[in-house]
């Protein structure tokens, strides 16, 4: 079951989330929007197991990376039965 992984532009390019991910869902890509000149990207969301280690590792006050579990996404969209 894949989950939705959202990277926000508050990312500071620290790579903590990438290193914390046990399934290599995240990677860093070039980006001029922060001092580190890179941002996290989630090209392999189908491999996300929903452990949320990336969220726990994020040092920003507003989590720059969020994992939305499939049942959370369904509930938030009002599609739950």
Curated annotation (Swiss-Prot):
Membrane topology label: Peripheral membrane protein
Binding, [4Fe-4S] cluster 1: 11, 14, 17, 58
UniProt-annotated binding residues for [4Fe-4S] cluster 2: 21, 48, 51, 54
A GO CC term assigned to this protein in UniProt: photosystem I
SUPFAM superfamilies: 4Fe-4S ferredoxins
Signal peptide interval: none
Name this protein carries in UniProt: Photosystem I iron-sulfur center
EC number assigned by the record: 1.97.1.12
Chief location of this protein within or outside the cell: plastid
EC top class named in words: oxidoreductase
Any one of the GO BP annotations: photosynthetic electron transport in photosystem I
Assembly description: The eukaryotic PSI reaction center is composed of at least 11 subunits.
Record-linked Pfam families: Fer4_7
Gene3D superfamilies to which the protein is assigned, alphabetical: 3.30.70.20
